Amino acid sequence: MALATRCKAPAAVCAAHSRRSVKVSAHKGAFEQVQVAAAAVAAAALLASPANAGVVLQQPELKKVFQDDAPAPAPVKREFKGLAPPSLPKPVEAPKPAAVAAAPEKKEEVKESGSDLDPRSIALPGALALTIGGFFAASKIDTSFNEWFIEAVVKDSNNYAGYEATLKTDAGVVFPKAATAGTKKVKAATGSKKGGFPFGGKK
């Protein structure tokens, strides 16, 4: 009996211990599940909410030192639409006359009484007639007027033009002597007295 009770007692203690451990492990498992669920809910909330940490991520812009920053102009497309007709100027409309225009006052023209002869048409013929008449009158009054007028108008050629220095001598004009030796030789060669060459066989 004692041995049986001794054997039963550890078995009961072992069963009680095993029950407690199962309960503790059950409590621990439930607590861990609650923690995992809370962590999952917190992670989901953090992932769903936007991150406002105050840090702005921006890529640095590289500057092109040797290139123009201005954008390249777009190519212009040229379309040939044919030759356009020449543009004619618009006709200018004449100003319309006023409906009631004041009649201009007529000025009385005063005609001067007198001859309608233009003095310029008489000036030239009168000057010519006066000059010729004066010349004839002076020649009739003074007989030496004609000589004086001719000497005044015509150049004196008694002293020549001034360039013929060899012709100016005290004795007057000196003409060169005619060379007769040549003509005599020609006459002797041809056999004619008058000189020249015989034509037609006559000597």
Swiss-Prot record:
Highest taxon in the source lineage: Eukaryota
Basic and acidic residues composition-biased segments: 104-118
KW Metal-binding (keyword) present: no
GO CC annotations on file: chloroplast thylakoid membrane
Keywords in alphabetical order: Chloroplast, Electron transport, Membrane, Phosphoprotein, Plastid, Respiratory chain, Thylakoid, Transit peptide, Transmembrane, Transmembrane helix, Transport
Name listed for the protein in its UniProt record: Cytochrome b6-f complex subunit petO, chloroplastic
Recorded topology in the membrane: Single-pass membrane protein
Post-translational modifications reported in the UniProt record: Phosphorylated.
UniProt family annotation: Belongs to the petO family.
Bilayer-spanning residue ranges: 121-141
Subcellular location: Plastid, Chloroplast thylakoid membrane
Residue range of the transit peptide in the UniProt record, numbered on this chain: 1-53
Region (Disordered): 79-118
Reported function: The cytochrome b6-f complex functions in the linear cross-membrane transport of electrons between photosystem II and I, as well as in cyclic electron flow around photosystem I.
CDD domains the record matches: petO
Residue ranges that the UniProt entry lists as topological domain Stromal: 142-203
Lumenal side: 54-120
